[in-house]
């Protein structure tokens, strides 16, 4: 008999929570049933049961050969194989299998039937549930094949059993708690029949129980490292302190398939992986054990990554990306990989600034910059840093920009920011900052901190501050001592200086090497052989260095090439003027600046030639006022304003030019590109409200067009652009009342018609009315090939796409806004061009960003139900004036109609409506001058095109069958909104009316039900407009009051659980004759059925029941003499209609995207109560988890949680009936975008550099080997060194000089000696 030994070191791992189980692999269960104790061997049946799923076929095997198989009439969990009387021919080894989707399952455990009169030998195995240390809990399982056996556990050395059990099934579990060394030993299990204590089974195979953890734990290391690419080699070394042990290595994700043993001579073992694969990623550990299976502690877990791309890293700056000079800042770098080194890089520098080794990378890794200066400002990123070679590609990474604020220094650099701090020793109400060089400059602050940015190099100057206190808010203090901001202006940085120095140095080195080669060739063109190596080496080295330098320059240029990120520019603000003309047009002039961006913090007003005028914070309307007072000659000039956001300054607004104290500001004229034969609008912006506009053409004295007061701007229209309309245009503004005051003419606008390509096709992939944060893609396409595209917003270029190589026969470009902001709205268009010819502008797309203003109300006039062929007007009622409105229909991408209005509402006419106009409509309003910031969408309004109102439905809540005194609400429900309802009661002349309902439901509450409330009700629509459309009444509702008669009884035939398609009869038995019976179902507001039988019982027949007929039923009855006054409810009766219960739904929370190391809760929900849920994972034979509430927590330990899941459930009252599995739910891993690490050009350059370096090394090695031999020859002939030879060579090269020295003779000899060689 073979002795089976189990080491708890392994078994405690196998079933550790969160790990993959090795012991259970979806094996079926096989057991015996017989008619013992009367005749235990005369009627034997073998049962085979599937562990987790139903099957259509089952197979019985005997002695490794097929004996028989059964196909049941329907899928089931278990089947029986009848054996009959046990004879010699029936003895043997039995196993069974069941049919899965792709073949037969694993066979069951072996059942051995021996000769009659002896029970089968039980199966004996062991499991542990905690880590393998003394004190863990162990379960010993004994499987006895028969029901209701007595199980005995014996231990070697003991005559009596150490434990026994009488379980109800076929298996006993013997538990050993707090495992101790005294529990070691050999165990066996035997069984016998309770009624026949003398009939014993054969002893099971023995188990040797060994307590692990008796030896110290080994160390596990990886060579060359724990992170490698697929296809590379890995060596794992497990080293312990004791020689002669057997070492074992395992991967926790798949213990059964990745379990390795080695018995080396030394105290260490190497486990080799020659060709790594992605699936080799996981957590590895090792241990060792002696010949008696006494094991060591487990090594520390070693995580091995096999990946072709590093996961993405991220970088976070603390405390802020904007840091004051001299302070400390930490850059925290993180990623999915731990135990790997990290390196901090700064843009513009090749070498890393700092390193973090692998031991310190534990998830909270920070690089520290102390006493930051301007040199530390820049863009930083972090990467994984490995100390071994690997071919893993670098993934994408985020960058952060560190800005250094030069406080408290007073040295001001152009483009930098300084914080001026005004401080006093007592509380103040407000601080004020003045700039002596700008008399109109003034800033205010509550905390005394003023940020000064040196825009346009004008930040230097002398500043002072003052304050006021709350007790005297109108009195300001004396000014502080002045502070002067000075310093060199410019943008030179150490980085740029170093770059230039490197370039100059490289150029000088190349020039020096070239000069050296020329000099050697000129001075030594007649050198003898023993010095020839110097010339060859110098030339070779010089040329190799030149080639390497050029390659390095090319590599740097290629490596520093960055992908251009298209960022939406900060929209420029709008500037205008307000005054109280015509009474005093220049006595009280105020300039206003407004930004279309909702994130604007401050506004700055500037004047050409003077600079900074003033700064004002943004109001709630995202605007600011700059009062100038009475207009004087000092105010004349050109003004513009900027808006400031968190880290950006907008473009300047259009310039407003004040030209005199009695002349209106000069307007600004603009127009789109003129296209032959098409309409052209010329825009004239006049800065002030209530002005008249005039358009002039050069060469004509009178205006070509004039417009009255239409706001601050006017649009002149040329209906059809022709050659005669070309020329220079200008516009002027004037006051509306005499005496007229005119502005200066605007700058001229030249209109020239050019030959153009046809306009492109321009659209958005989804609706142009979007919510903040949405993704918007613009598609610009043309039939012309190889075109470049430009995207415009409000006439300004914001993005381009060069040479969009599309499908044959056309070109296409896609412009993407990943997350729309409130300032991204506007009018978008596109154009395409080739080398010299441009296309016409596309039709504009108005992108409206909603949820900035309150939603409007949409109403239909005369009503939402319209006869075919009639007109209907949809009125969109907003809140603010001067908005633009858009009408949308559900199912269409683009708005149906647009309207601009000076009021607060817009009317959209649907003319001669037909069936295609039926549907839901909504509307939105938005600003046209402020990036199309829009309102939320209105509540949808359904428009019905029909000659008859749809029939409403009347129901009662909570039910139409209620007890006396209860409150009930009658709901008249219909699909038409904005219509009144009328409620009728049978036998009464008056009706209840509900006018102008704004929802699609009308509620009629009835308080404290009494006898007067009992009756039959109906309802109908009651439109508040005159309409020939027909009105239909609703269904009739009977309001029944219960509790006045004895309750009936309710029975079901044939039973409470039936298969779909069968017939069911519900029998309601009352106690009084001449009654009407009412059948009710829980959850429904209306009775299901009513009957008036001749006797005391009503039979409610339900033919061909379906799943939806499942539920809780009850019944009541009432007498014909007192209708609708009913009895108490019968007892509730629950009915299940199922062959298989309906499949559940499976969802994931918070999402199906699985981040490594994070948990996901899978929620399995079914329609039936009192069930038990089971979760299955594709690739695993056995169910993974069971739950009564349907919640399963999946931890993605080692990345094993990813895959396809499904769930099912079974009824606790009917445990053999399982539902269909749910739809498959896939959990996927979060993966960042993979970035291409280097270009093909850089790969080629890098290869050439390697070739050059190798060639350089070979040349130097060859010459170095020649040098000692040449030195020896030279010393034998003339005994002089290299220096003397060079000097003589120089002398020989001089004209008129002869040399007869022995050295020269020796040189000649040396030359002659080498010729034969």
Swiss-Prot record:
Residues 521-531 are cytoplasmic. Residues 1-20 form the signal peptide. The keyword Repeat applies. Coiled coil: none annotated. Residues 21-112, 114-211, 216-302, 311-398, 400-481, 570-658, 659-753, 758-850, 854-938, 946-1041, 1046-1131, 1142-1223 form the Ig-like C2-type domain. The chain crosses the membrane at residues 500-520, 532-552. One of its GO terms (biological process) is regulation of DNA-templated transcription. GO terms for molecular function: activin receptor antagonist activity; inhibin binding. Residues 1296-1309 have a biased composition (Polar residues). Residues 21-499, 553-1317 are extracellular. InterPro entries: Ig-like_dom (IPR007110), Ig-like_dom_sf (IPR036179), Ig-like_fold (IPR013783), Ig-like_Receptors_ImmuneReg (IPR050412), Ig_sub (IPR003599), Ig_sub2 (IPR003598). Keywords: Disulfide bond, Glycoprotein, Immunoglobulin domain, Membrane, Receptor, Repeat, Secreted, Signal, Transmembrane, Transmembrane helix. Residues 1290-1310 are annotated as: Disordered. GO terms for cellular component: extracellular region; membrane. Disruption phenotype: Mice are viable and fertile and show no alterations in FSH synthesis or secretion or in ovarian and testicular function. According to PubMed:23143598 male mice show diminished pituitary and serum thyroid-stimulating hormone (TSH) concentrations, reduced pituitary thyrotropin-releasing hormone (TRH) receptor expression, decreased triiodothyronine concentrations and increased body mass. The keyword Repeat applies. Disulfide bonds join 48-96, 238-286, 333-382, 422-465, 780-830, 876-923, 1068-1115, 1164-1207. Glycans are attached at residues 43, 328, 371, 871, 967, 1063. Interacts with INHA; the interaction is not confirmed by standard receptor binding assays. Interacts with ACVR1B; the interaction appears to be ligand-dependent as it is diminished by inhibin B and activin A. Interacts with ACVR2A, ACVR2B, ACVRL1 and BMPR1B. Interacts with HECTD1. Seems to be a coreceptor in inhibin signaling, but seems not to be a high-affinity inhibin receptor. Antagonizes activin A signaling in the presence or absence of inhibin B. Necessary to mediate a specific antagonistic effect of inhibin B on activin-stimulated transcription. This is Immunoglobulin superfamily member 1. It comes from Mus musculus (Mouse).
């Amino acid at each position: 008999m073979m002795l089976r030994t189990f080491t708890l070191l392994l078994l405690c791992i196998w079933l550790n929570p969160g790990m993959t189980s090795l012991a259970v692999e979806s094996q079926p269960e096989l057991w015996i049933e017989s008619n013992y104790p009367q005749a235990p061997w005369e009627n034997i049946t073998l049962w085979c049961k599937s562990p987790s799923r139903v099957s259509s076929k089952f197979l019985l095997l005997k002695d490794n050969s097929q004996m028989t198989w059964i196909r049941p009439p329907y899928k089931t969990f278990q089947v029986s194989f009848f054996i009959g009387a046990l004879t010699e021919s029936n003895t043997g080894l039995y196993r069974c299998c069941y049919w899965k989707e792709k073949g037969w399952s694993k066979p069951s455990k072996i059942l051995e039937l021996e000769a009659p009169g002896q029970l089968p030998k039980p199966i004996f195995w062991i499991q542990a549930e905690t880590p393998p240390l003394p004190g863990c809990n162990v379960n010993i399982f004994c499987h006895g094949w028969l029901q209701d056996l007595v199980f005995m556990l014996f231990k070697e050395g003991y005559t009596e059993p150490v434990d026994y059990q009488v379980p109800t099934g076929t298996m006993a579990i013997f538990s050993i708690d707090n495992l101790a060394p005294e529990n070691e030993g050999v165990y066996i299990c035997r069984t016998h029949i309770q009624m026949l204590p003398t009939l014993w089974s054969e002893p099971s195979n023995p188990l040797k129980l060994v307590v692990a953890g008796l030896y110290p734990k080994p160390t596990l290391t990886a060579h060359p490292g724990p992170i490698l690419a697929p296809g590379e080699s890995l060596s794992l070394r497990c080293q312990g302190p004791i020689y002669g042990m057997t070492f074992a290595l395992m991967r926790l994700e798949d213990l059964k398939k990745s379990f390795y043993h080695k018995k080396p001579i030394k105290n260490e073992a190497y486990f080799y992986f020659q060709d790594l694969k992605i699936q080799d990623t996981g957590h590895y550990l090792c241990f060792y054990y002696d010949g008696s299976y006494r094991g060591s502690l487990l090594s520390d877990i070693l995580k091995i990554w096999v990946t072709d791309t590093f996961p993405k890293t991220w970088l976070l700056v603390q405390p802020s990306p904007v840091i004051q000079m001299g302070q400390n800042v930490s850059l925290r770098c993180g990623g999915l990989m731990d135990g790997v080194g990290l390196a901090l890089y700064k843009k513009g520098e090749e070498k890393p600034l700092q390193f973090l080794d692998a031991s310190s990378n534990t998830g909270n890794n920070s690089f520290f910059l102390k006493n930051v200066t301007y040199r530390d400002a820049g863009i930083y990123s972090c990467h994984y840093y490995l100390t071994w070679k690997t071919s893993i590609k670098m993934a994408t990474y985020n960058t952060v920009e560190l800005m250094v604020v030069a406080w408290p220094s007073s040295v001001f650099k152009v483009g930098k920011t300084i914080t001026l701090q005004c401080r006093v020793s007592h509380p103040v109400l407000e601080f004020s900052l003045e700039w002596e060089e700008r008399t109109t400059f003034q800033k205010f602050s509550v905390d005394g901190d003023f940020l000064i940015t040196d825009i346009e190099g004008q930040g230097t100057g002398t500043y002072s501050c003052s304050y006021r206190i709350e007790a005297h808010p109108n009195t300001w203090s004396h000014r502080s001592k002045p502070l002067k901001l000075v310093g060199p202006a410019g943008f030179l940085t150490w980085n740029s200086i170093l770059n230039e120095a490197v370039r100059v140095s490289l150029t000088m080195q190349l020039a020096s090497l070239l000069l050296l080669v020329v000099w050697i060739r000129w001075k030594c063109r007649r050198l003898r052989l023993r010095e020839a190596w110097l010339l060859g080496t110098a030339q070779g080295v010089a040329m190799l260095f030149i080639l390497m330098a050029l390659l390095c320059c090319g590599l740097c240029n290629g490596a520093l090439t960055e992908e251009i990120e298209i960022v939406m520019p900060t929209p420029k603000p709008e500037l205008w003027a307000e005054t109280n003309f015509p009474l005093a047009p220049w006595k009280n002039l105020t300039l206003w600046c407004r930004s279309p961006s909702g994130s604007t913090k401050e506004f700055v007003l500037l004047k050409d030639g003077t600079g900074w005028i003033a700064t004002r914070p943004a109001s709630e309307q995202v605007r600011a006022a700059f009062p100038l007072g009475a207009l004087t000659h000092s105010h004349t000039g050109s003004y513009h304003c900027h808006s400031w956001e968190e880290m950006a300054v907008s473009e300047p607004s259009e310039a407003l030019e004040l030209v005199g104290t009695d002349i209106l500001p000069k307007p600004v004229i603009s127009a789109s590109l003129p296209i032959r034969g098409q309409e052209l609008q010329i825009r004239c912006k006049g800065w002030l409200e209530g002005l008249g506009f005039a358009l002039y053409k050069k060469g004509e004295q009178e205006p070509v067009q004039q417009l009255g007061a239409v706001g601050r701007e006017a649009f002149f229209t040329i209906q059809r652009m022709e050659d005669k309309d070309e020329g220079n245009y200008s516009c002027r503004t004037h006051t509306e009342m005499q005496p007229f005051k005119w502005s200066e003419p605007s700058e001229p606008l030249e209109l020239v018609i050019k030959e153009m390509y046809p306009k492109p096709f321009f659209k958005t992939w989804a609706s142009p009315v979007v919510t903040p944060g949405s993704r918007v893609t613009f598609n610009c396409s043309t039939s012309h090939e190889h075109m470049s595209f430009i995207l415009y917003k409000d006439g300004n270029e914001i993005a381009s796409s060069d040479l969009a190589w599309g499908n044959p026969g056309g070109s296409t470009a896609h412009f993407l806004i990943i997350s729309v902001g409130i300032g991204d709205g506007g009018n978008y268009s596109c154009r395409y061009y080739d080398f010299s010819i441009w296309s016409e502008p596309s039709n504009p797309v108005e992108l409206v960003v909603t949820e900035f203003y309150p939603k409007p109300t949409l109403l239909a006039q005369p009503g939402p139900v319209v006869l075919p062929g009639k007109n209907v007007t949809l009125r969109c009622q907003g809140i603010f004036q001067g908005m633009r409105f858009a009408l949308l229909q559900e199912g269409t991408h683009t708005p149906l109609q647009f309207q601009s209005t000076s009021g607060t509402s817009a009317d959209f006419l649907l003319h001669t409506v037909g069936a295609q106009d039926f549907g839901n409509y909504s509307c939105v309003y938005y600003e046209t001058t402020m990036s199309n910031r829009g309102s939320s969408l209105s509540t949808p309004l359904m428009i019905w095109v029909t000659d008859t109102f749809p029939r409403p439905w009347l129901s009662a809540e909570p039910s139409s069958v209620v007890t006396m005194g209860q409150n009930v609400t009658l709901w008249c429900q219909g699909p038409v909104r904005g219509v009144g309802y009328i409620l009728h009661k049978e036998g009464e002349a008056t009706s209840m009316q509900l006018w102008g309902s704004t929802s699609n439901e009308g509620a009629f509450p009835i308080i404290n039900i009494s006898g007067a409330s009992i009756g039959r009700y109906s309802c109908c629509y009651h439109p508040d407009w005159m309409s020939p459309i027909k009105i239909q009444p609703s269904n009739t509702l009977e309001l029944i009051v219960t509790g006045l008669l004895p309750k009936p009884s309710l029975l079901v035939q044939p039973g409470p659980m039936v298969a779909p398609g069968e017939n069911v009869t519900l029998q309601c038995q009352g106690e009084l004759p001449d009654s009407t019976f009412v059948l009710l179902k829980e959850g429904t507001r209306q009775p299901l059925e009513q009957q008036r039988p001749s006797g005391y019982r009503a039979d409610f027949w339900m033919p061909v029941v379906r799943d939806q007929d499942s539920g809780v039923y009850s019944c009541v009855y009432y007498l014909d003499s007192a209708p609708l006054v009913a009895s108490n409810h019968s007892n509730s009766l629950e009915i299940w209609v199922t062959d298989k219960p309906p499949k559940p739904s499976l969802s994931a929370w918070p999402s199906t995207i699985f981040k490594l190391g994070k948990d996901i809760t899978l929620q399995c929900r079914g329609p039936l109560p009192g069930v038990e849920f089971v979760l299955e994972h594709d690739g695993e034979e056995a169910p993974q988890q069971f739950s009564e509430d349907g919640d399963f927590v999946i931890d993605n330990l080692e990345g094993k949680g990813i895959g396809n899941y499904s769930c099912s459930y079974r009824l606790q009252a009917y445990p053999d009936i399982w539902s269909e599995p749910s739809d498959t739910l896939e959990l996927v891993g979060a993966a960042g975008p993979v970035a291409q690490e280097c270009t093909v050009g850089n790969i080629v350059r890098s290869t050439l550099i390697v070739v050059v370096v190798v060639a350089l090394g070979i040349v130097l090695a060859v010459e170095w080997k020649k040098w000692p031999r040449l030195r020896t020859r030279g010393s034998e002939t003339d005994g002089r060194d290299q220096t003397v030879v060079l000097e003589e060579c120089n002398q020989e090269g001089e004209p008129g000089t002869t040399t007869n020295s022995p050295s020269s003779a020796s040189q000649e000899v040396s030359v002659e000696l080498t010729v034969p060689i």
